[in-house]
């Protein structure tokens, strides 16, 4: 653990004392080396399932893939941000990179925390750098509105969790994940315990986000700069899913009777948000709503608590993290050239940037869960476990899958095919940096086809 955490913290002095000429290249190289070193986390200790760094930090098969995804994303965010941050004053460039590094530190500590209160502190700490990135480096003036939505939705959702954790500490005298899961609640059917159950989960449902409390996400995604969109889609939403998987084991047996409305909302949200995608004119907004749709599947899977659904949830979270981040990078390459996110203004780009069209096709096919992508593995595990739980769910999940395929192909056709507009004839060519960035997104997805058990979690 410390072999990753200490080099990551040492990126701060590197950022502030590095010569301007080598700033971006050195930070990218160092963070890429850290991410390659983090791949050693796949060799967790299978005898006990946990690899302890100390009393408060440990890794298991559930947190290892998410930790590696977090480390993998930092060099990609820095690569993606170079074009639009480089013209700014040097101090602002250093602050921007420092915020991205601090996000990685907080996320590593959140995913490896074994104490619930440490997890909560790190869960909340990720809010500050993300908020600054959105409100300071966003493209339009609506970024302040988006930042306000993001802040208040997340904080109002998280406060009940803090109160619930303090009650738990008072009752059990510990907040260690290892001990809580073996302790039982007195009188699980009481109203107080039902409120406590809701308080424990609502923070994670807002963060995922569940349909109904998702309005902050499209705003935050649309207004955030590219690095903000990438970290939000790839890792911060997964923090909600990870928190749910950790805490829901401790909430039995109340979950069996309390989960029904949330499962219904999650599955209904899959169809609703997929339908919203079909009528979006804004490219980033469409990708943001598709994230809500995929996270609805994950939320439903976690709430029914079967080994298959847990494996499907973690698989889909990792696969979706890489694919949605790649889609945001592609949307950003369009935005940097056309200076508009409107789908209609970017038609026929395939003729001008043919290799970029290949990346669009690969990312969209992975997004619609084409076999044999890990997205399909996750969706099949989730849909089959939901069908086993209730046969009627197949109607909604099936419709959701069909609409997902529709809007993914619609997104590809609208941006790449059709007659090329006159104003697109003088576009800048694509850069090696952009192709490297997209290779580093798509390659892990293709490699995970060969060994998907790396991201199945601890239920197999």
Curated annotation (Swiss-Prot):
It catalyses: a ubiquinone + NADH + 5 H(+)(in) = a ubiquinol + NAD(+) + 4 H(+)(out). The chain crosses the membrane at residues 22-42, 59-79, 94-113, 117-139, 148-168, 195-215, 231-251, 258-278, 286-306, 310-330, 343-362, 394-414, 436-456. It comes from the Eukaryota. Disulfide bonds: none annotated. It is a multi-pass membrane protein. It is an enzyme of class 7 (translocase). Coiled coil: none annotated. One of its GO terms (molecular function) is ubiquinone binding. Keywords: Electron transport, Membrane, Mitochondrion, NAD, Respiratory chain, Translocase, Transmembrane, Transmembrane helix, Transport, Ubiquinone. Its main location: mitochondrion. The keyword Heme does not apply. Its EC number is 7.1.1.2. NCBIfam families: NDH_I_M. Core subunit of the mitochondrial membrane respiratory chain NADH dehydrogenase (Complex I) that is believed to belong to the minimal assembly required for catalysis. Complex I functions in the transfer of electrons from NADH to the respiratory chain. The immediate electron acceptor for the enzyme is believed to be ubiquinone. This is NADH-ubiquinone oxidoreductase chain 4.
